[in-house]
Amino acid sequence: MKDLRFRPAAAEDFTFLATMLGESAVWRPDKRTPTGDEVLADARYAMYLAGWPRQGDYGLVAEQDGPVGAAWYRTFTETSHGHGFVTTDVPELAIAVIASRRHEGIGRRLLADLIEASIAQGYPAISLSVAGDNPARRLYESSGFVPVEQHGTSLTMIRHAARST
């Protein structure tokens, strides 16, 4: 990962984060990945970035000759929340790496750094939603995430802060 760097996500990264949200929402190679604009027009996904960055939001962007991946988390309310919602004090994360750069360890590093940040910020856990057949599920499980609920073909997974990476 020569010359690969990781930096905090900023307001200026909004468009790239929207693109990454599309990558995470439709990860199957045989399906068309929605554009950032399409993702933001879909209420199911727009909530992951609405008003970015809000108080408590945290994210990272991986860069090597331009952005290649991103991961971020935010908390939600009982009445307005994402697919991997657990409780109001557990942020839900979103993560994606551009297709041409997958399987290089970028996602693992983004995930590890985001977990570390959530612990440093005092969160008791971090959650996510993943399709049961998504290969990224293995990354999440190897990073300490465990399934807590199933919704159709998707799993809500949680990783408690006490577990070391």
Residue ranges of predicted features:
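Conserved N-terminal entry element of GNAT/NAT acetyltransferase domains
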Residues: 1-12, 24, 163-165
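Hydrophobic pocket/interface hotspot
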Residues: 17
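Active-site rim helix/loop that mediates acceptor-substrate recognition in acyltransferases
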Residues: 34-59, 64
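Short hydrophobic/aromatic beta-strand element in the GNAT-like acyltransferase core
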Residues: 56-61, 70, 94, 154-156
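Conserved acyl-donor/pantetheine-binding loop and adjacent beta-alpha core of acyl/acetyltransferases
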Residues: 63-64, 68-95
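C-terminal "cap" of GNAT-fold acetyltransferases
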Residues: 87-91, 124-137, 141-165
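A short, internal acetyl-CoA/4′-phosphopantetheine-binding micro-motif in the GNAT/acyltransferase core
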Residues: 92-103, 130
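Conserved acetyl-CoA-binding loop-helix of GNAT-fold acetyltransferases
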Residues: 94, 103-120, 141-142
